[in-house]
Amino acid sequence: LNMLEPVGETLASEYPYXK
């Protein structure tokens, strides 16, 4: 699991890094 680069849509939604 990459906290800096979430490859999962669910992860990106819960943890919008960079966005």
UniProtKB/Swiss-Prot annotation:
| The protein's required cofactors | [4Fe-4S] cluster; Mo-bis(molybdopterin guanine dinucleotide)
Query: Has UniProt tagged this entry with the keyword Iron-sulfur?
Result: yes
Q: Where in the cell is it found?
A: Cytoplasm
Gene Ontology MF term list: 4 iron, 4 sulfur cluster binding; chlorate reductase activity; metal ion binding
The EC designation for this entry is 1.97.1.1
Field pH dependence: Optimum pH is 7.5.
Which residue spans traverse the membrane? none
Query: How is the cofactor bound here?
Result: Binds 1 [4Fe-4S] cluster.
**In which domain of life is the source organism classified?**
Bacteria
The reactions it catalyses are:
chlorate + AH2 = chlorite + A + H2O
In its keyword annotation, does this UniProt entry include Membrane?
Answer: no
Report the GO terms under cellular component: cytoplasm
Query: Which keywords label this protein?
Result: 4Fe-4S, Cytoplasm, Iron, Iron-sulfur, Metal-binding, Molybdenum, Oxidoreductase
Top enzyme class, one word, equals oxidoreductase
Q: Oligomeric state and partners?
A: Heterotrimer of alpha, beta and gamma subunits.
What exactly does this protein do?
Reduces chlorate and bromate.
Name of this protein: Chlorate reductase subunit alpha
This protein's species is Stutzerimonas chloritidismutans
From which lineage does this chain's organism come?
Answer: Bacteria, Pseudomonadati, Pseudomonadota, Gammaproteobacteria, Pseudomonadales
